[in-house]
Amino acid sequence: MKTIVVCSGGLDSVSLAHRTASEEQLIGLVSFDYGQRHRKELDFAAKCAARLAVPHHIIDIAAIGGHLSGSALTDNVEVPDGHYAEETMKATVVPNRNAIMLAIAFGLAAAQKADAVAVAVHGGDHFIYPDCRPGFIDAFQRMQNEALDGYASVKLLAPYVEVSKAAIVADGTRHGTPFAETWSCYKGGSLHCGRCGTCVERREAFHLAGVSDPTEYEDRDFWKAAASQYSAAEVR
């Protein structure tokens, strides 16, 4: 299938891009600038597109993001430290982010006569992000079937929606993902902080997958204390 991958430049979506390039006909990556403080992730998405020799579309929706106030990712709100399974991580929710991005990606796919859009939502996101859950994925597909009826037929591929980030690390390893060329940290500093939810989850995923983590962290060991109160099953 001719497939466009929604790629932020993070570990999950870059791994998905490499997987898609090996299993489908990857025809491009689409990324979004929504005013996120960690905009540097887009540079890693660009590197991925160049590596896989496909077009890279960066869609500027910062004006929209500016109205979705109250998130630590876009506003002057401190990014909390700790595990994603903690209630405090709800500060990182950008309301309706995936719905907005996927609607645009589906429009792009229809215009380019693509067969599918692939997105890297995964099981570890379910606790905090409602637009990463299977119910949302299924509902969005039904909505797009109606929205594009008679014009295009585009499938939503979400192969990681029921699996852990550790499983994505394992999958990325199989498909040759260069993990050092991905960016996760929400704080957007020169190095991964090692303390925010996405850094803790990233560090923990490599550990659980038994794969060496090439990432440079400002605090390489914080994840141990943050993750110690949760079982592997709880952080799916």
Swiss-Prot record:
UniProt-listed InterPro entries: QueC, Rossmann-like_a/b/a_fold
Entries under CDD domains matching the protein: QueC-like
GO terms, biological process: queuosine biosynthetic process
Residues binding ATP: C7, S8, G9, G10, L11, D12, S13, V14, S15, L16, A17
Pathway: Purine metabolism; 7-cyano-7-deazaguanine biosynthesis
A molecular function GO annotation: ATP binding
EC number: 6.3.4.20
Cofactor: record remark: Binds 1 zinc ion per subunit.
Protein family according to the UniProt entry: Belongs to the QueC family.
Function as written in the Swiss-Prot or TrEMBL entry: Catalyzes the ATP-dependent conversion of 7-carboxy-7-deazaguanine (CDG) to 7-cyano-7-deazaguanine (preQ(0)).
NCBIfam families: 7-cyano-7-deazaguanine synthase QueC
Name recorded for this polypeptide: 7-cyano-7-deazaguanine synthase
